[in-house]
Regions:
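Conserved functional hotspots at enzyme active or ligand-binding sites that engage polyanionic ligands
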Residues: 1-126
Length: 126
């Protein structure tokens, strides 16, 4: 994953295709149960090659996240030097149609944060 402001990043954003590590502002409704609701920030986990089909695999970013914090499924953004703050809830992975949900690009997170999130998601699958 390239750093913020890289040529790859600008091209992907210009094409309107999010890439792994991008933060999007997106409408998460409709939701059920404990799923995060309304217009929220999400971290894109899937690569641009997949996302070009109109779907993204994401984890929500929240200011709460009690369960995620207590059980090791939270990655904090507080010391990441990013505009987006809160925690990435690694246990609430979902696939979204970013075009239909009116997603807008916010920023790209540092590679070490994205790698930490991916590692925690993998523990759910192993």
């Amino acid at each position: 994953m390239a750093g913020a402001g890289s040529r790859r990043e600008r091209t992907a954003v210009k094409r309107g295709v999010p890439d792994r590590g991008d933060v999007l502002h997106i409408d998460l409704d409709p939701t059920e149960g404990r799923e995060q609701r309304s217009k929220s920030y999400v971290l894109v986990l899937s690569p641009a090659d997949f996302n070009r089909f109109g779907l993204v695999l994401v984890c929500p970013i929240t200011q709460g996240g009690g369960f995620a914090r207590e059980h090791g499924f939270a990655v904090s953004l507080s010391a990441a030097g990013t505009r987006t703050q809160g925690i990435v809830s690694c246990h609430q992975v979902r696939t979204l149609d970013y075009k239909e949900r009116g997603a807008s690009w916010v920023e790209t997170l540092p590679e070490e944060i994205v790698d930490d999130v991916l590692a925690r998601v993998r523990t759910l699958l192993d």
